[in-house]
Amino acid sequence: MAESAGASSFFPLVVLLLAGSGGSGPRGIQALLCACTSCLQTNYTCETDGACMVSIFNLDGVEHHVRTCIPKVELVPAGKPFYCLSSEDLRNTHCCYIDFCNKIDLRVPSGHLKEPAHPSMWGPVELVGIIAGPVFLLFLIIIIVFLVINYHQRVYHNRQRLDMEDPSCEMCLSKDKTLQDLVYDLSTSGSGSGLPLFVQRTVARTIVLQEIIGKGRFGEVWRGRWRGGDVAVKIFSSREERSWFREAEIYQTVMLRHENILGFIAADNKDNGTWTQLWLVSDYHEHGSLFDYLNRYTVTIEGMIKLALSAASGLAHLHMEIVGTQGKPGIAHRDLKSKNILVKKNGMCAIADLGLAVRHDAVTDTIDIAPNQRVGTKRYMAPEVLDETINMKHFDSFKCADIYALGLVYWEIARRCNSGGVHEDYQLPYYDLVPSDPSIEEMRKVVCDQKLRPNVPNWWQSYEALRVMGKMMRECWYANGAARLTALRIKKTLSQLSVQEDVKI
């Protein structure tokens, strides 16, 4: 009621304040001088027999400061004059009785600082919807997650049950069969294309991973244990599924197995209930890649010949087409380099990483090129690949590109040959001509435009083995792919050299 009364009396007061109630007249003995905001003619000063007043209020969003005089007759009721009262929400007023005592500044009423309250726009139906909607959505998400997890667990357990119930799997993998027995079975199998798929799956799911031994753009390589023997497990990231599928497919090509090609054991997409791992299991070679081996060790002339001859033998077998019922298509590697060749315990090479390989069907004369986003290693690309003049419809073009890369690998091996106490530090091909990670444009400029090749030192001429290696390299590096040596020709030349040097292979 007090606030309503204050509000109803506010506007007459505003009129009074804005108009100014003070006047200027002859000053009496007891007259009081006050500041007056509306007394322009008397220098903003008024005189009264009552009180000085200062007030601040907000009118239509505009802040007003009023100072004036209140006559004594208007100071009613006595003791608590109406004009001197403040209202918390409307105005702040102060009366005083000393000359110019109203020259003080008052605070704006707190009510004017508050935002006006808006009536609620939500009815009961809307409020129920706002509360129930998120609850229902959360409940739905929980159900979906539960169903997905339950589905994966059922699939996983069903696969385990099927593997356990498969009698042929039990016959093939008896408890006393070791890794050596399995490798022997693979080597002597009639098809030469690897184990049956259900056996591969069983082997892959009983491997225990031991340690990570390498990383690449495809994923990781682990050393694993299976029945007392070491195996290499290449684990592909999920985005590299095409590479995994392609490499597994190439490794299981009929009649592919060869002592100088990495021994394939199994491939499996392991579903552990929440995500899928893509595994490719192969023989384990503790020396690692040829790149790692040459970085750590120098080689003798005998060691150089063994590495070079075994690499040529593996590549010749890849390139070879075997005609017949159990025939083998010709295969080109397309990413041959020292990091994709492994060194076995006996000092021989095994060609690995067939994810980019292509197969040639001699009957239809077609080339099986898988849709894969990967490209070969730029440093090892042949001139015709760099300048994009390679004939993609002619299988021999891919074989010639492999030979060019093999010549670069031979250069890496020969540099580390310790002859008469002389050897050179390990370096990648073109190390002195391009940066560590060259672009295709940088390689094209060096290889195609400037026609440069790795340097063959003159002192190699003093040793027959190095002289032959240097001559072969140059014949592998011809700009014209058709003029390069074949893998079979290289193999025969190195076989003759091994006899001359009395190298026991």
Curated annotation (Swiss-Prot):
GO terms for cellular component: activin receptor complex; cell surface; plasma membrane. Its EC number is 2.7.11.30. It catalyses: L-threonyl-[receptor-protein] + ATP = O-phospho-L-threonyl-[receptor-protein] + ADP + H(+); L-seryl-[receptor-protein] + ATP = O-phospho-L-seryl-[receptor-protein] + ADP + H(+). Residues 1-23 form the signal peptide. Pfam families: Activin_recp (PF01064), Pkinase (PF00069), TGF_beta_GS (PF08515). It is found in: Cell membrane. Keywords: ATP-binding, Cell membrane, Glycoprotein, Kinase, Magnesium, Manganese, Membrane, Metal-binding, Nucleotide-binding, Phosphoprotein, Receptor, Serine/threonine-protein kinase, Signal, Transferase, Transmembrane, Transmembrane helix, Ubl conjugation. Residues 24-126 are extracellular. The active site is at D335 (proton acceptor). The chain crosses the membrane at residues 127-149. GO terms for biological process: activin receptor signaling pathway; cell surface receptor signaling pathway; extrinsic apoptotic signaling pathway; G1/S transition of mitotic cell cycle; hair follicle development; in utero embryonic development; mesoderm development; negative regulation of cell growth. Residues 150-505 are cytoplasmic. Autophosphorylated. Phosphorylated by activin receptor type-2 (ACVR2A or ACVR2B) in response to activin-binding at serine and threonine residues in the GS domain. Phosphorylation of ACVR1B by activin receptor type-2 regulates association with SMAD7. The modification Phosphotyrosine is found at Y380. Glycans are attached at N43. ATP binds at I213, G214, K215, G216, R217, F218, G219, E220, V221, K234. Belongs to the protein kinase superfamily. TKL Ser/Thr protein kinase family. TGFB receptor subfamily. Forms an activin receptor complex with activin receptor type-2 (ACVR2A or ACVR2B). Part of a complex consisting of MAGI2/ARIP1, ACVR2A, ACVR1B and SMAD3. Interacts with SMAD2 and SMAD3. Interacts with SMAD7. Interacts with FKBP1A. Interacts with IGSF1. Interacts with CRIPTO. Interacts with TDP2. Interacts with TSC22D1/TSC-22. Transmembrane serine/threonine kinase activin type-1 receptor forming an activin receptor complex with activin receptor type-2 (ACVR2A or ACVR2B). Transduces the activin signal from the cell surface to the cytoplasm and is thus regulating a many physiological and pathological processes including neuronal differentiation and neuronal survival, hair follicle development and cycling, FSH production by the pituitary gland, wound healing, extracellular matrix production, immunosuppression and carcinogenesis. The GS domain is a 30-amino-acid sequence adjacent to the N-terminal boundary of the kinase domain and highly conserved in all other known type-1 receptors but not in type-2 receptors. The GS domain is the site of activation through phosphorylation by the II receptors. This is Activin receptor type-1B. The lineage of its organism: Eukaryota, Metazoa, Chordata, Craniata, Vertebrata.
